[in-house]
Amino acid sequence: MMKCLSLQSKMILYVAIGALFAFMGGIVYYSTLDIPELEKSEIELYSVEVIEVNNFENYISLKNTFLIKNFGEKTVTVPVISYEFFANGKFIGTSNFSAEDIPLTGRALLISGTEVPFTTKIKIDLTEENENEYMKIANGEHVDYSADGLYTIETAWQVIDVEFEN
């Protein structure tokens, strides 16, 4: 009788462990269902504003606004935007936006069908390589700005990095 009870206890333990692994696998599978929704976002360099031109220390501060659109059905957040910044096609610096230190519930929400602006600042130092673009920006001349980089977009279940160029 004791041997039979021991075998039954082992079977219950094995079934419980198997059920636990099946449950964990189901959670992983469910989380991957968000990936197509995360890929339905789009980022655009919306505006660039000159904040400060410091002729004494030879730098310019710019405020860049990125507009992120959510075309998916799920509500998402954007914790990180990292990018290289170009003026007239010439590299002039890098910058980033980060909300990683803010809990997921406190970040800007991109509800389905919405557009949300994210603002960053970039400091451009005068160098020999960027002198022409620097002077055009400082003098208020027309400059075509662009940015290439990576942004992270996430739901409560999944996180992906998306590359962008614009």
Q: Where are the model-predicted features located?
A:
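Membrane engagement elements in two modes
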Residues: 1-57, 156-166
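Short structured motifs
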Residues: 46-52, 66, 101-106, 130-134
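Short, solvent-exposed loop/turn segments enriched in Ser/Thr/Gly
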Residues: 58-65, 139
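Intrinsically disordered, low-complexity Pro/Gly/Ser/Thr-rich segments with frequent PxxP/GP/PP motifs
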Residues: 89-130
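Terminal connector regions
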Residues: 123-166
